[in-house]
């Protein structure tokens, strides 16, 4: 961190990593913010999904034993220790951010005294093709519904199976844009069309071209946001989902679809789809109108980035860290004000010179040979056009090779 002059660390995920980054940041006096994209800080299974009961009872740590045994092949309930470690580190964050209020509430159920901000993800609306002549309509006017993304058990695979079975010999056609975990469903069947993988930017138009009337987002874990929902809304298509997580939160907020209890059956959902089909001019059109109204104010990626930029600037400028010179206690905001007064080449020259002096002191000092060599090498790789590039190599050769060999020869000769 000191070598790279890091002013702020933004952590997005730590899966397959150690938690050392928290302690190193604190030791080096570097502030960090943490954005939670899932529930890894609560359980390493990430999704809070129980294959037997669907809903994870995350508040009851004693009930975690059987789940841990199945998912991690361990007979030790390590969740209390896991949460203790995460909590002690999360308290050090200057800001904790989540993409939905539902996610915030779940995290606060476990870590009750944390301060958490909600910043919804942004999404850039693609230009939808207005040429509806591309729409693929069946002679019998089939009613098309779609599943989107990678459909695993926790993403509602059992409902894809169930609805395919119900749709046989009906006027309902089911489409899958993406792939199913069970390869059996990665091929066409009666009243079922498998489209396979797609580019994210193409999805809204794919939904329109295939005349999709409803999108089924049947996640069985509390998703923290859902870009597939955003893509469905951009295509102005109402959705069916469960009363769970950020998807339900967002659908309720704009009345963009229908929400079912988590233990609803595929038969229940199919019956409802038939009622929507029979009354396509009624409530369905109201949902579409709500979506159109929402799209006028839908947050863009740029707007989201601006929210984060404000947090970055506020955190960097107010955190009491030392500037480049360890003897200079000016605040970061003063440093950046001075930087703006200089042209980029002047700033780079100052950085090169300061770094040269720092590494020269390391070479001349008592630091281990390997560290001195590593610092010298990194400087030469970083500042390839610097006028100090060859000087630092000479300093290393002089102090670490010539001087040491001379001293060694002198010692052997006279002592």
PLM feature spans:
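Nucleotide-sugar-dependent
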Residues: 216-227, 248-249
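Conserved donor-binding/catalytic core segment of Leloir-type glycosyltransferases
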Residues: 138-155, 161-164
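Short hydrophobic beta-strand element within catalytic cores of glycosyltransferases
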Residues: 214-217, 238-241
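Nucleotide-activated donor-binding/catalytic signature segment of Leloir-type glycosyltransferases, i.e.
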Residues: 181-210
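Membrane-proximal helix-turn-helix segments that form the acceptor-binding/catalytic region
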Residues: 27, 57-95
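Helix-loop-beta element that forms the nucleotide-linked donor phosphate-binding surface
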Residues: 87-88, 92, 104-124
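A charged, aromatic-enriched C-terminal amphipathic alpha-helix characteristic of glycosyltransferases
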Residues: 267, 281-317
């Amino acid at each position: 961190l000191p070598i790279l002059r890091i002013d702020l660390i933004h952590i997005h995920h730590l899966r397959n990593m150690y938690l050392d980054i928290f302690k190193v940041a604190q030791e080096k006096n570097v502030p960090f913010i943490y954005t939670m994209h899932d529930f890894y800080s609560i359980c390493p299974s990430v999704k809070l999904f129980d294959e037997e009961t669907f809903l994870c009872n995350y508040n009851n740590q004693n009930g975690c034993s059987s789940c841990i045994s199945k998912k991690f092949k361990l007979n030790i309930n390590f969740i209390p220790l896991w949460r203790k470690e995460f909590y002690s580190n999360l308290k050090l964050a200057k800001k904790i951010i989540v993409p939905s209020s539902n996610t915030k509430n779940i995290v606060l159920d476990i870590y009750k005294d944390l301060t958490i901000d909600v910043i919804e993800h942004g999404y850039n609306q693609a230009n939808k093709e207005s040429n509806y002549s591309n729409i693929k309509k069946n002679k019998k006017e089939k009613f098309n519904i779609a599943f989107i993304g990678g459909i695993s058990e926790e993403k509602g695979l059992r409902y894809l199976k169930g609805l395919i079975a119900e749709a046989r010999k009906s006027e309902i056609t089911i489409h899958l844009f993406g792939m199913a975990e069970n390869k059996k469903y990665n091929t066409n069947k009666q009243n079922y069309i498998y489209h396979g993988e797609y580019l994210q930017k193409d999805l809204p138009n794919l939904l329109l071209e295939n005349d999709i009337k409803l999108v089924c987002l049947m996640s069985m874990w509390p998703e923290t946001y859902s870009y597939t929902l955003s893509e469905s809304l951009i295509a102005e298509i109402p959705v069916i989902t469960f009363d769970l997580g950020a998807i339900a939160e967002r659908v309720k907020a704009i009345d963009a679809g229908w929400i079912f209890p988590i233990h609803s059956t595929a038969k229940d959902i199919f019956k409802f789809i038939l009622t929507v089909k029979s009354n396509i001019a009624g409530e369905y059109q109201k949902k579409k109108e709500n979506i159109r109204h929402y799209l006028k104010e839908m947050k863009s990626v740029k707007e989201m980035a601006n929210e984060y930029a404000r947090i970055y600037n506020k955190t960097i400028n107010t955190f009491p860290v030392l500037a480049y010179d360890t003897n200079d206690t000016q605040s970061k905001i003063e440093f950046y004000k001075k930087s703006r007064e200089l042209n980029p080449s002047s700033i780079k020259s100052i950085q090169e010179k300061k770094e040269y002096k720092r590494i020269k002191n390391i070479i001349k000092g008592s630091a281990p040979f390997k560290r001195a060599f590593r610092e010298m090498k990194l400087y030469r790789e970083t500042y390839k056009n610097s006028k100090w590039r060859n000087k630092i190599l000479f300093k290393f050769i002089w102090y670490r090779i010539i001087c040491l060999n001379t001293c060694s020869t002198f010692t052997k000769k006279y002592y």
